[in-house]
């Protein structure tokens, strides 16, 4: 895990109660408080890559409002410092392609607020792209709740679905002064990683750590301790970090 995503390290208010309202009529809303990022192919535009932390290219004011009101795919990301943050994902670049960076690259280069906002945007955009049709009746679905749900367009169905999140564990296994690492055949020579895997139904996260470690290496572990968590929208995980002893 490259960087901590501790919730206390950003001041983003998800403002979930606003999702089912007309945000533009909210008592604190003003056009000059709109902030909009236009993503392209899961990449985000950077204003200036010569300074760190990198600065996201946020559209503001009336231009941002026009994009949001004319789009059927705008996502409300939350509130911060009195501003209303949104994102839209487009199929053609709005700016020069060399302005766009993927989130893996941006991860250690953004401040915590921007990183939290873009992580939210990428995870939700991926889910929307994979859920355009109803899983019950097969009818086309449409975005609702400012990007935080989809609803079936079939009046006889109207099934409402919500974003998927897959819990995954990643663990540092140690024995005395050694640590247990793994690698995949397709990785470059010399590249190794701590072990990781998805949590399955009917098990605790600690059991998932022990199971994944044994399945991948044949090593039994003890003293499993949870450490930290972070969003991992590649494509839709919540990564749970552990330490354990072999």
Description of each model-found segment:
Residues 119-172:
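Cys/His-rich short segments
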Residues 94-136:
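A gly/proline- and charged-residue-enriched helix-loop-helix capping module
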Residues 44, 150-194, 220, 244-246:
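N-terminal strand-loop-strand
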Residues 230-246:
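Active-site-adjacent beta-strand/loop module that shapes the phosphate/pyrophosphate-binding cleft
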Residues 194-228, 242:
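The catalytic Nudix box helix
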Residues 1-111:
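N-terminal alpha-helical interaction blocks
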């Amino acid at each position: 895990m490259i960087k901590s995503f501790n919730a206390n390290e950003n001041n983003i208010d998800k403002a979930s109660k606003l999702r089912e309202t007309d945000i533009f009529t909210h008592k604190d809303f003003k056009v000059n408080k709109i902030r909009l990022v236009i993503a392209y192919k899961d990449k985000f535009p950077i204003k200036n890559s010569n300074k760190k932390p990198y600065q996201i290219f946020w559209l503001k004011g009336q231009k941002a409002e026009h994009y949001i009101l004319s789009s059927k795919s705008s996502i409300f990301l939350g509130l911060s410092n009195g501003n209303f943050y949104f994102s839209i994902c487009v199929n053609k670049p709005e700016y020069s392609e060399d302005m766009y960076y993927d989130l893996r690259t941006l991860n250690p280069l953004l401040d915590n607020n921007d990183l939290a906002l873009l992580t939210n945007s990428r995870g939700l955009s991926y889910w929307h792209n994979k859920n355009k049709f109803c899983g019950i009746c097969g009818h086309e679905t449409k975005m609702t709740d400012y990007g935080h749900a989809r609803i079936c367009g079939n009046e006889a169905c109207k099934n409402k679905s919500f974003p998927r999140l897959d819990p995954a564990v990643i663990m540092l296994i140690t024995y005395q002064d050694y640590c247990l690492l793994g690698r995949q055949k397709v990785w470059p020579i010399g590249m190794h990683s701590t072990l990781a895997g998805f949590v399955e139904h009917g098990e605790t996260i600690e059991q998932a750590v022990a199971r994944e470690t044994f399945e991948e290496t044949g090593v039994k572990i003890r003293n499993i301790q949870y450490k930290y968590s972070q969003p991992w929208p590649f494509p839709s995980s919540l990564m749970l970090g552990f330490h354990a002893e072999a």
